[in-house]
């Protein structure tokens, strides 16, 4: 019930509403979003649009892009891929709205850096700290708990293809190593997270997409058949309506939402950290992250798996299906390639998630928590990663899905209430562009209460 009909209806309706309200912003301003990615920050040493994008992409582009897609195909059918595309396309507008709002209502810390997110715009614009704290709480347990346990499980599951894998021992060894490595990175705080993700994300994306392209080129004659499978299964309404919970629609929505996180309220925490002259700039950049995630990385996985001709069965859902697919093209090197990609994807996801968690801990405490508290929390979070490696696939996915749904059901209504502000800010940006200027934001120009927009006073 939580996912269907509630979340499916909320996500789809909100995405379509924002798409119409912004005048198809994800299509009209797509090239503008690409141009803005490499824009330099306003102040030297501040967080650039690119680095903020890499943090959100590090979290978005994770194990779900490989194993989430393969699981959706094996359990929901090839049509799941189409519904992932739909969620991404309409979700681009939702991502733009939430990230623009995060920029508008962001705050400034003692070092001059900016921070913010849904919890902050809920408190500042809706004057509801209780709801903001509730959102922050769900984000913390979702990202430090559910998502990190899932990433840890997904990573260790790729090692099951090797003869030395012992299901009673190996998951715990991998979990311990992963927890220790992530613990080291996150002990350095936000700046270290930004540096690590800025290096890892482009590398892992290029390696994985290159491998997928090779597989697709080797089976280029099957691509028309692959698209035929996707569309035929996507519109098999008798199958969908006959068993919604296990249909391609349901798995497409679940894995699409998990993969691109549009509307969930996570990426705005990274968006708020970017030092830009106008909130819309980062809103557009974060919108691009949704397309990188689903329309590029997830599609690469789907094409690679379906074009390989590997039989689709429920028994190989997850790592097995992807590894079998790449083995067709790369032989015994295939599983090794997927393992390397999974290590990079899982690691970047884990450390990117902690950027969001830190932001919400600051919100709940009303200031940056003490060093001893943060050290203790990060040690506990590293232990959660260790525990996640030993979980079952069903438990890992179910926990992540349920927690993410609660975040979405708080953030989307907040965006609907505040969406008019984001649209006003967008029109201000477009007006300045038409005048031939590099847009600079002044809160008073769009009629905002200056007491609510601390950073832009």
Annotate each predicted stretch with a short phrase.
Residues 1-63, 73-80, 91, 416-457:
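N-terminal alpha-helical transmembrane segments of multi-pass membrane transport
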Residues 2-32, 74-112, 292-300, 402-412:
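Extracellular loop-to-transmembrane helix junctions
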Residues 90-98, 176-190, 201-221, 254-257, ...:
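Selective recognition of specific alpha-helical transmembrane segments in multi-pass small-molecule
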Residues 19, 97-106, 211-229, 237, ...:
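Extracellular/periplasmic helix-exit of transmembrane alpha-helices
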Residues 10-17, 21-34, 154-159, 170-218, ...:
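Membrane-interface loop-to-helix entry segments
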Residues 14-19, 87-112, 118-153, 157-185, ...:
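Helix-loop-helix module between adjacent transmembrane segments
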Residues 21-26, 65-69, 78, 145-156, ...:
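Transmembrane helix-loop junctions in multi-pass membrane proteins
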Residues 43-75, 101-119, 123-125, 140, ...:
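Alpha-helical membrane segments and immediately flanking helix-loop junctions
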